[in-house]
Amino acid sequence: MGDELHNRLLHQNDGTKDAILYKIIESLVCSICHDYMFVPMMTPCGHNYCYGCLNTWFASNTQKELACPQCRSDITTIPALNTTLQQYLSFILEKLRDQNDESFKKLLTTKTKEENDYKNDKEKDTLFDKVFKNSALAVADDSDDGITRCSNCHWELDPDEVEDGNVCPHCNARIRNYAGGRDEFDEEEYSEGELDEIRESMRRRRENRFASTNPFANRDDVSSEDDDSSEEEPMREHIPLGRWARSHNRSIAVDAVDDEDDEEEDEEEEEEMDSDLKDFIEDDEDDEDEDGSRRNLVLSALKNRHVIITDDEEEEQRRHATEEEDRDSDFYEHNDDGFVSGDSLDEDQKEVTRIQSSSDSEDRSLSYSGSSDVKDNNDDNTEELDDPQPKRQKRFRVVLGDSDDE
């Protein structure tokens, strides 16, 4: 089975063999200078560049972290020589050697020069201009809440201070990875059991930090919410945050106190508003009760009166009743739907007139000596609603109580 590809390749046509060979030669070309990699160097992320191009790339980015030119991943370890690609290119050049071709001679000269440069730098221990010798890493100190420190002098690194120059403030060493960043958590690198242990460890560390800085940590509602949020939070933290996490938790605790004070003030304002509205509504009910009692007193006084109507007045009333009946009939004929009739309107109008008469009688001064004539003067608006006919004045003779005196 180990020689399966060998046998298949031998039986392929020339076109297939040429395509495979062309792809192999393409993998020997540097993506920066687009020339053959006589000294191919492989970065930790797996990309390959020639030694000269990668050396120039590191030298031109002295104020930034060392990163891959293609994927921008941090290069924390020195790139290694890719001997496999180097052997491929050397074998192809050996088979295609042509001493009479000037271009081929130039190609071999370039190959020899680059290989010698690499050998000399390696012997002198000056690979990549000593950039990896003179630089340091930002590492997390697990024994001190994961605080980021310089790998050379172990000085604490503040991301705000090293953000611009990316240099250790103590030993002035170049930090070749981002001091304030956090490695991306790759769940595929761990088994399910290991992932559970990591989640539990992170949850306990988060709870301990929260309990040490939050004054509400002992409350059940806060602790339960923290547990829920910690379980649902994505697995993005690979190292603890150190003192920055503690300062962040302190700010969360202060915000929680301010929010609780604001809620208490809102509740007090709502209670005061409800109390004011309640007093206002109760005053209206008291006024309505007072008006109703006054109206009942007036109506009861009117009920105790006896009204005596003279003959002339009876004749006038009969004539008026006849006219009202005619008017009611005409009114009902024009309303075939039967929803409203003149009789019902008269009864409603009589009730309105009676209440208004009671109100008018309350305002008058009721003083009688013997018998007196009382005129019922209705409002102009009431008469317009009742009947468009001219106003009529009715005379009444009122007897108070059971007295025979007029």
UniProtKB/Swiss-Prot annotation:
It is found in: Nucleus. It comes from the Eukaryota. Residues 209-406 are annotated as: Disordered. PANTHER family: B-BOX DOMAIN CONTAINING. It comes from Saccharomyces cerevisiae (strain ATCC 204508 / S288c) (Baker's yeast). Interacts with POB3 and SPT16. GO terms for molecular function: ubiquitin protein ligase activity; ubiquitin-protein transferase activity; zinc ion binding. InterPro entries: E3_ubiq-ligase_TRIM/RNF (IPR051051), Znf-RING_euk (IPR027370), Znf_RING (IPR001841), Znf_RING/FYVE/PHD (IPR013083), Znf_RING_CS (IPR017907). The modification Phosphoserine is found at S143, S191, S403. Residues 223-232, 256-274, 281-291 have a biased composition (Acidic residues). PROSITE patterns: ZF_RING_1, ZF_RING_2. Its main location: nucleus. The modification Phosphothreonine is found at T310. The gene is PSH1. GO terms for cellular component: chromosome, centromeric region; nucleus. This is RING finger protein PSH1. GO terms for biological process: proteasome-mediated ubiquitin-dependent protein catabolic process; ubiquitin-dependent protein catabolic process. It holds the Pfam family zf-RING_UBOX.
